[in-house]
Curated annotation (Swiss-Prot):
Function statement: Mu-conotoxins block voltage-gated sodium channels. This toxin reversibly blocks voltage-gated sodium channel in cephalopods, with no alteration in the voltage dependence of sodium conductance or on the kinetics of inactivation.
Modified residues (6'-bromotryptophan): W17, W37, W38
Listed name of the protein: Mu-conotoxin-like Cal 12.1.1c
Subcellular localization(s) per the UniProt record: Secreted
KW Secreted (keyword) present: yes
Taxonomic lineage of the native organism: Eukaryota, Metazoa, Spiralia, Lophotrochozoa, Mollusca
Tissue spec: Expressed by the venom duct.
Gene Ontology molecular functions: ion channel regulator activity; toxin activity
This protein's record includes keyword Secreted: yes
Amino acid sequence: DVCDSLVEGRCIHNGCWCDEEAPHGNCCDTAGCTAWWWCPGTKFD
């Protein structure tokens, strides 16, 4: 698993992620969020 320290140290695999406070903005859509950016990796672990 690849953990991105820029995203509160949370593990991401497919870039599926949703957090307005993330440095990259709303990275992905896992529960209805708008994907503004794709986080590195391939899916939330």
